[in-house]
């Protein structure tokens, strides 16, 4: 798959899409204050078997939209703060009534937020800057970084909880963990060791949620298997579906199944083609474009409406307006929100758009894997030869630098090391090649399966960063003591400070040179 594309042009980096401006950061600091207050009272109620569903939805959606999102806008901020200013006083009153009934004194949280007063943008930015400077002054760099890490893990948990909800599965333990994480921020300074323990607890739960999500997907759509996916476009009206929530792709396909409108997937949504059920939809034609790294060009050239499913991390400020839709909790300026699974506006937009006039013939790629068959092939190799080490190479990072590194790694790794590569491939006796495509669960699935069955040392390489990567790396390191190495990531997900802290606290390393990394791992 990797040789189909040229990623010299990365719009994510070159247009600043993967960076966060100070104005946005300040507004997000203020929203964290609302989250902390909400969690304090929601946790008190939860401990007494009371779940406020409105607050639950607000907290989960705020974190899934807020963390590591460079396109978070002032409009988003106003929508969220208005909702909290409406619901928080009600939540506090609910808590007071509970305390009244129990005959206990309410434990109020001290906060600079005034719930009954709307913050204008200027005052909000000033408050956010003040909160940021307070953290810099009062917290050590390591503690600040651990808080950032735990927020990224919280985002991963929230996304998994919300995705499970689309399969009508309620993950109460996931919501409870989010409340515990947020409430830990209400302590003046939690010790680094306590934060580390909380992080380890959170990543174990997150992995459980990810397993539950995969089970739900396979129960609904069938067991994953290898499948051919076409990049060919066909003359017809078309819709592009973006993101990772395949349940929402199903909703789109159901909405257009009796219409002459084709559907194409983009980026992580490609994984849907590995589930048998989606092959039954004649409207689903294949994959379009080169992924998030090239989203500006992909979106600008697609001749129809684009549906951004929940949690899609795209900056659309530079994109053509009028054909962008989202199912997310909040929508950016110019992006039309889809509510109650009503895709009628999307369908009309597709019918009115020019669509593909001639189409373009492109090659087909084989993606996906059958886990049991793949493990069988791996175990056969382990029986045939005595291997001293196992390398697992995760999903492709799609940069020339990454390509060069892993091409060299696969060639220079000694023959007594078995390599399971989920993306890059070189034909060698000690390499098992699989194209896991955008399957973020694949790396953990194989690492966990092999760690539980064999005592051979395992090293896991993460070429690509996504919203689940930090959680997965810490889980594998702490649960199975695997070596974990991470490639260069966009600063919005993992900056150099965080990499240093991951190294010092969890012994997770950044990639250096192939020779040095091999020497360090195999010494």
What are these regions (language model features)?
Residues 2-57, 193-523:
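Anaerobic metallocofactor- and corrinoid-dependent redox/one-carbon enzyme cores
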Residues 1-2, 94, 105, 271:
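Small-residue-enriched alpha-helical segments and adjacent helix-cap loops
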Residues 35, 41-220:
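Electropositive, gly/pro-rich neighborhoods at or near active sites that engage anionic ligands
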